[in-house]
């Protein structure tokens, strides 16, 4: 019996000693922010339904882990967790928070390998601590001046992201293994959010720019903001109610006097009258009905933005195109007036001129019409991608070159030739019309938006066309001149490649869906000729081949303009100079993922590129800057 007791005692002491020597499984990361930050849980709610949702969900979760890692870096100088047991414990803690939000109980195991958060000497240039960072890169880097504050401003965020990629490049050079680029980028993000940014990892600066976390609503870090917003809202509501009441009174007093007539029209016979303050002609509806044969099907020539377009002939013999505006989700009286006011004051040879307009109100609906000069050669899209049995000769290289330059000049005028600048927001083939000489003119300013100098727009209503929308605008409503540059880049690629912006017929690699990814991958692989429209590579009737070097330059400018990062796109003026050969085209940059990109996921062997990067749905990581 004594021997049995001694054996049990020794066994107990042995097990106690083993537990004491085993690594601690207590997680040092605080995940309380998972419940306080208004992050968008939509993709995580349906992560089991599509690969895209899963990738977006995993991206959000990676950011939620990155926030406390940045906090810990500042507190302990350690970039990652000490061992596998700690990493597993932290992922379990995160999963507990996610489950409390009624999300799936296996999200962390679905998205992560615990090893990816454990530090080791081979992660990135042997860096484990901030001391290692300083010893490798020096006491300061480009991040220190670019990422310290003010990152909610798009321009400053651009500069910070560009600095991040420069530092990443330094780290990859030091490491010597380009496959570690993703890990190095995560280190850059963690350092910028935890050490450099003055407001910290949970600030608006870090969440909106560094981590690019998709939020349900803007962050308000102080209760005072809520109070002020509530007070302003109540005041605005009261004022709005008074204004509406006044308008109702005016309507009942004066409404009958104008009901059923053209707005802004004075009955002075059949001659059109110049409307004050705009310079555009206001037609009577009877004139437009006569010109278009009562908007007959025979005169119908296509559908443009927000309406149907009819060909017409005025009494003086001039041919016009009349757009009959139809009500839609985006268009109303305010936007119609906006279009008239903007277009009527624009005069440039590469813009479609507005001849006039008409607006009729009756009991059932408002009818609005825009009158343009008729462009006899239709739109660019019809020439690039003929429909049905229509046969058109492929555009020649001189024609393609001329069209690209014309569009660039038209956009340069909108961005720099008028004050305030105008952003078109819907540059695409169907909005580029061709006159009798095949010169291009930018059309359809129904979505145009004026800008105050030096400003970027933030809007909750994104307008435009899928495949041409700049990612930062499509995802976050951040509108700048570079948004038009992105769309212009896509149009260049369509012209040079003879391929649609979104090619849904393509099978195989998801990289082939988007023309931007497809063209970039071929050019980076040294297969530029495979990206060019085949008709451009054949010799013309004269026996002379097209200038391959110039065509490649145009293709490279298109890729550069359509880069997912705002900071790496040129302005339209610089793009025009590159096209004309006045300045050199910089080397085509990689399409690097922004800070914490959803397209990277872990498989059994390490990080791989996810098909979501080039899928039809663009996610928060695809865009930034």
Swiss-Prot record:
It catalyses: L-seryl-[protein] + ATP = O-phospho-L-seryl-[protein] + ADP + H(+); L-threonyl-[protein] + ATP = O-phospho-L-threonyl-[protein] + ADP + H(+). It is found in: Membrane. GO terms for molecular function: ATP binding; protein serine kinase activity; protein serine/threonine kinase activity. PANTHER family: OS01G0750732 PROTEIN, PROTEIN KINASE DOMAIN-CONTAINING PROTEIN. Residues 1-20 form the signal peptide. Coiled coil: none annotated. It comes from Arabidopsis thaliana (Mouse-ear cress). Keywords: ATP-binding, Glycoprotein, Kinase, Membrane, Nucleotide-binding, Receptor, Serine/threonine-protein kinase, Signal, Transferase, Transmembrane, Transmembrane helix. Its EC number is 2.7.11.1. Glycans are attached at residues 40, 106, 121, 177. Gene3D superfamilies: Phosphorylase Kinase, domain 1, Transferase(Phosphotransferase) domain 1. It is a single-pass type I membrane protein. It is an enzyme of class 2 (transferase). This is Probable receptor-like protein kinase At1g11050. The chain crosses the membrane at residues 228-248.
């Amino acid at each position: 019996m004594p021997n049995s007791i001694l054996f049990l005692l020794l066994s107990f002491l042995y097990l106690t000693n083993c537990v004491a020597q085993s690594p601690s499984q207590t997680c040092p990361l605080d995940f309380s922010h998972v419940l306080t930050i208004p992050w968008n849980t939509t993709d995580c709610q349906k992560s089991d339904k599509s690969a895209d949702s899963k990738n977006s969900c995993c991206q959000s979760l990676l950011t939620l882990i990155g926030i406390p890692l940045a906090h810990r870096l500042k507190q302990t100088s350690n970039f990652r967790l000490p061992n596998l047991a700690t990493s597993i414990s932290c992922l379990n803690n995160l999963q507990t928070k996610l489950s409390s939000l009624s999300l799936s109980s296996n999200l962390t195991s679905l998205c992560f390998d615990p090893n990816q958060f454990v530090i080791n000497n081979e992660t990135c240039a042997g860096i484990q601590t901030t001391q290692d960072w300083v010893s490798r890169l020096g006491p300061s880097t480009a991040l220190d001046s670019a990422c310290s504050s003010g990152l909610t401003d798009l321009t400053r965020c651009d500069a910070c992201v560009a600095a991040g990629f420069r530092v990443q490049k330094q780290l990859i050079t030091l490491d010597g293994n380009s496959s570690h680029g993703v890990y190095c980028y995560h280190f850059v993000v963690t350092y910028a959010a935890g050490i450099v940014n003055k407001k910290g990892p949970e600030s608006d600066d870090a969440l909106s720019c560094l981590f690019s976390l998709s939020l349900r609503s803007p962050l308000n870090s102080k209760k005072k903001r809520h109070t002020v917003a509530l007070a302003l809202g109540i005041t605005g509501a009261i004022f709005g109610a008074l204004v509406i009441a006044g308008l109702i009174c005016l309507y009942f007093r004066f409404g009958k006097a104008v009901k059923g007539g053209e707005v802004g029209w004075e009955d002075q016979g059949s001659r059109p009258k110049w409307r004050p303050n705009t310079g555009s002609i206001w037609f009577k509806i009877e004139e437009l009905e006569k010109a278009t044969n009562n908007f007959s099907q025979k005169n119908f020539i296509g559908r443009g933005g927000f309406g149907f377009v009819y060909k017409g002939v005025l009494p003086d013999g001039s041919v016009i195109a009349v757009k009959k505006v139809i009500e839609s989700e985006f268009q109303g009286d305010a936007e119609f007036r906006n279009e008239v006011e903007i277009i009527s004051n624009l005069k440039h040879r590469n813009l479609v001129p507005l001849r006039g307009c008409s607006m009729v109100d009756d009991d059932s609906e408002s009818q609005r019409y825009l009158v343009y000069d008729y462009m006899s050669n239709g739109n660019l899209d019809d020439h690039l991608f003929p429909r049905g049995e229509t046969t058109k000769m492929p555009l020649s290289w001189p024609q393609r070159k001329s069209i690209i330059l014309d569009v660039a000049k038209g956009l340069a005028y909108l961005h720099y030739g008028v004050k305030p600048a105008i952003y078109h927001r819907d540059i695409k083939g169907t909005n580029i019309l061709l006159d009798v000489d095949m010169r291009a003119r930018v059309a359809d300013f129904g979505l145009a938006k004026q800008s105050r100098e030096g400003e970027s727009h933030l809007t909750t209503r994104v307008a435009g066309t899928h495949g041409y929308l700049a990612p930062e605008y499509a995802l976050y409503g951040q509108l700048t001149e570079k948004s038009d540059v992105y769309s212009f880049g896509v149009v260049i690629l369509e012209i040079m490649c003879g391929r649609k912006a979104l090619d849904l017929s393509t099978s195989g690699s998801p990289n082939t869906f988007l023309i931007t990814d497809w063209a970039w991958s071929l050019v980076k692989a040294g297969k530029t000729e495979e990206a060019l429209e085949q008709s451009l590579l054949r010799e013309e009737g004269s026996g002379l081949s097209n200038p391959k070097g110039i065509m490649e330059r145009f293709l490279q400018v298109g890729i550069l303009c359509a880069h997912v990062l705002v900071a790496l796109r040129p302005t339209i003026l610089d793009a025009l100079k590159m096209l004309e050969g006045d300045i050199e085209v910089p080397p085509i940059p990689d399409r690097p993922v922004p800070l914490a990109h959803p397209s990277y996921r872990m498989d059994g062997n390490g990080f791989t590129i996810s098909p979501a990067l080039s899928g039809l749905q663009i996610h928060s990581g695809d865009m930034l800057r």
